[in-house]
């Protein structure tokens, strides 16, 4: 066990996970920790509005593949992160959302800028946890970051402001990084059979292809099947547009060629996509989603499998 302050423990966990950039606006509820950022190699990017910080964090992670942190002052500042956090959630962007909270001693008594911050984000994050004891600061933060990475979505840590500057005995927690699991034998066998017998297979590539570093794998299977590749809404980066089999994005502001081609598919291989409405509902008067095709869906979130027919 080592003695250190709660903010030192917090920063050490950030370093363990390689978090080097934070975006947002820092208020009095987070100032003790921000003083440690420069020496820890963490760059804080101040913005004019909290929403900008969240949107930049989303864009940063989507373009670099590195998880970032967004911060705002408790109460009204945190409410400014609602739009970017929900956006990141639907974009499958892992992100650490840090929400300083009113002091634990005054919670429920109308503490300084007290807001139900956990309820505010409960349907916008894949995981959320409030620090209930200063000695558990590192443990909770480590778990929240891991959940964000595993769930490929924002995760929230809520920290009462009076938990900073406390000296604690602590042992830094280990990082337990789960390996990406393969599909079940029977499911993969059935998928292979469907693709082998397909007369006109079409691939739909989504965010998971990018996040899973699987663009080259997607290219290989497309070339093996000689299958055109459509990209999901907002995920043009999931397949190189210069490739001969690339036909563009589906749905809103999408490619008519992509819509016409996928409408003829007898098997659709949906890779790394939750099959959201913007990639499946009619566009430009074209009801393109193939009603009779077999759908092979591969996605990190099992709750989304089979949700869209």
Predicted regions and their residues:
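N-terminal alpha/beta PP-like core and its mobile active-site loop of ThDP/TPP-dependent enzymes
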Residues: 1-309
């Amino acid at each position: 066990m080592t003695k250190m302050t709660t903010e030192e423990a917090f920063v050490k966990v950030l370093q363990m996970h390689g978090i080097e950039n934070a975006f947002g606006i820092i208020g009095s509820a987070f100032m003790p920790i921000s003083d440690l950022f420069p020496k820890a190699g963490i760059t804080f990017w101040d913005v004019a509005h909290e929403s900008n910080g969240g949107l930049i964090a989303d864009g940063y992670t989507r373009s670099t593949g590195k998880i970032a942190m967004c911060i705002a002052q408790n109460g009204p500042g945190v409410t400014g992160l609602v739009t970017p956090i929900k956006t990141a959630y639907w974009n499958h962007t892992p992100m650490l959302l840090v929400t300083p909270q009113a002091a634990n001693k005054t919670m429920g008594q109308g503490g300084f800028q007290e807001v139900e911050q956990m309820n505010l984000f409960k349907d916008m994050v894949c995981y959320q946890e409030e620090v209930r004891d200063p000695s558990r600061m590192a443990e909770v933060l480590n778990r929240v970051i891991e959940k964000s990475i595993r769930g490929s979505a924002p995760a929230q840590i809520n920290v009462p402001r009076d938990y900073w500057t406390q000296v604690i005995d602590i042992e830094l927690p280990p990082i337990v990084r789960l390996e990406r699991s393969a599909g079940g034998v029977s499911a993969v066998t059935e998928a292979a059979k469907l693709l082998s017998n397909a007369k006109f297979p079409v691939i739909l590539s989504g965010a998971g292809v990018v996040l899973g570093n699987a663009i080259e794998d997607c290219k290989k299977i497309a070339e093996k099947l000689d299958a055109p590749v459509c990209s999901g809404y907002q995920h043009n980066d999931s397949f190189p547009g210069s490739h001969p089999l690339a036909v563009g994005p589906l749905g809103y502001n999408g490619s008519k060629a992509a819509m016409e081609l996928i409408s003829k598919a007898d098997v659709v291989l949906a890779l790394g996509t939750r099959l959201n409405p913007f990639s499946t509902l009619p566009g430009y008067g074209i009801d393109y989603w193939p009603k009779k095709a077999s759908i092979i869906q591969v996605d990190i979130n099992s709750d989304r499998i089979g949700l869209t027919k």
